[in-house]
Amino acid sequence: MVLVVGATGGVGQIVVGKLLEKGAKVRILTRNAEKAKKLFNDKVEVFVGDIRKPNTLPAAVDHVTHIICCTGTTAFPSARWEFDPEPNLFEWGKILLDSDYREATAKNTPAKVDAEGVSNLVATAPKNLSRFVFVSSVGILRKDQPPFNILNAFGVLDAKKKGEEAIINSGLPYTIIRPGRLIDGPYTSYDLNTLLKATTGGKLNVVIGKGDTLAGDASRIDVAAACVESIFYSASEGQVFELVNKGIRPPTIDWETLFLQLPT
């Protein structure tokens, strides 16, 4: 049983589709059961919960063998940060300038999702889990360099790094994928059958590497494929790698060879 967290998002939807194509049993953790049902019908088990609320997690992780975590929020303050109450013009100025005020008034910041939420999920995961796969971001180790210093203005790379550290330090088998700027989609208005017909618009090859040296775009379709394929190959276990699209794309992507080329 594979638990997909963030399953109704741009990458997560494709992850679910690719898992189902492979015949895997899929469970999803979602805050919005209605949206999940529209996307996946009855093809997956749906558990309502929230990684920001640890007490909602134990039932969802019970008897799962793998967790694929594709959660996230916007890098910059937006409605997706779930401010309560909704800020007026003056308050928006305070949000942009005062980090303490920002965290106090928003429920869905990068810190609350990618750092605290992921840490909650890791702490609740079964101790005999076969793999924890996490979608992070390029630039984690270059947050003081442009353009990543701009991307990290409100702490998204800091939060992703804390999420990575929680996973690495947990003792669980893991794979951490750091994609470039996400393209192709998100396909949030299509049903599952339409979603599975989506193809990478750029037709570029998949390039993976270590050490946070890569930059560029990454197809959501290829990122989702990397998440799914990684759980089937031991060479990807314990690996943290970047993924971007560059060069001429071959007829098929040989994921096993890509994973085997990663330094251990």
For each predicted feature, which ranges?
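A conserved pocket-lining segment of Rossmann-fold NAD(P)-dependent short-chain dehydrogenase/reductase
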Residues: 198-218
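Substrate-positioning beta->alpha
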Residues: 117, 159, 212-229
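Alpha-helical substrate-binding/gating segment
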Residues: 219-264
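Conserved beta-loop-beta element that borders a ligand/cofactor-binding pocket
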Residues: 131, 136-141, 146, 150-153, ...
